[in-house]
Amino acid sequence: MARYTGPAWKLSRRLGISLTETGKEIAKRPYAPGQHGNSRRKMSEYGLQLQAKQTLRHMYGVNERQFNRIFNDAGKMPGIHGENFMFLLEARLDNVVYRMGMARTRRAARQLVNHGHIQVDGARVDIPSFRVKPGQTISVREKSKNFVVIKEALEVAPATKDFVTFDAEKLEGTFVRLPERSELNDQIQEQLVVEYYSR
């Protein structure tokens, strides 16, 4: 399944959750778009599981094949499958760039990585799905340090999560550790995703 490239606000309203984690998309109209959007039907158990999966997939901007592969990798780790799955999604390079405040959205962060503006431990990496390891340093390439998009994003960036650090002067940060579940979006129901794949 291809990656969704339409308006994030429209998809957020359809899924009933803020995919950008700002809450702005659904603050004024907390119902699905369209003529009958204000009347949500009661979902089946399968429908809830599917929606949880689609919500998580769209939030991190991952296509179906990548999503499935990350889910399987999470199943090989010790601990809770669903939580490990979210931790691996958080360790994607595009997401770490977003968490550090260098991009306003994960989609914008993915573009920065794709276009070669980002380095990992001093080496250029242009693969958004690159899995960042704890302790690795993420920085902006020297020739990209005056990039307006990055500067504008940093001006409005929220405080960084405790599992990343970022120096706005050097445009450099560290992925300190994998996050704890309590540090991530509490509206995500990752256990429903596990149930979806366990059918």
Curated annotation (Swiss-Prot):
Keywords: Ribonucleoprotein, Ribosomal protein, RNA-binding, rRNA-binding. One of its GO terms (molecular function) is structural constituent of ribosome. InterPro entries: Ribosomal_uS4, Ribosomal_uS4_bac-type, Ribosomal_uS4_CS, Ribosomal_uS4_N, S4_RNA-bd, S4_RNA-bd_sf. Residues 91-153 form the S4 RNA-binding domain. One of its GO terms (biological process) is translation. Gene3D superfamilies: Ribosomal Protein S4 Delta 41, Chain A, domain 1 (1.10.1050.10), RNA-binding S4 domain (3.10.290.10). GO terms for cellular component: small ribosomal subunit. One of the primary rRNA binding proteins, it binds directly to 16S rRNA where it nucleates assembly of the body of the 30S subunit. With S5 and S12 plays an important role in translational accuracy. Belongs to the universal ribosomal protein uS4 family. Part of the 30S ribosomal subunit. Contacts protein S5. The interaction surface between S4 and S5 is involved in control of translational fidelity. This is Small ribosomal subunit protein uS4. It comes from Exiguobacterium sibiricum (strain DSM 17290 / CCUG 55495 / CIP 109462 / JCM 13490 / 255-15). The gene is rpsD.
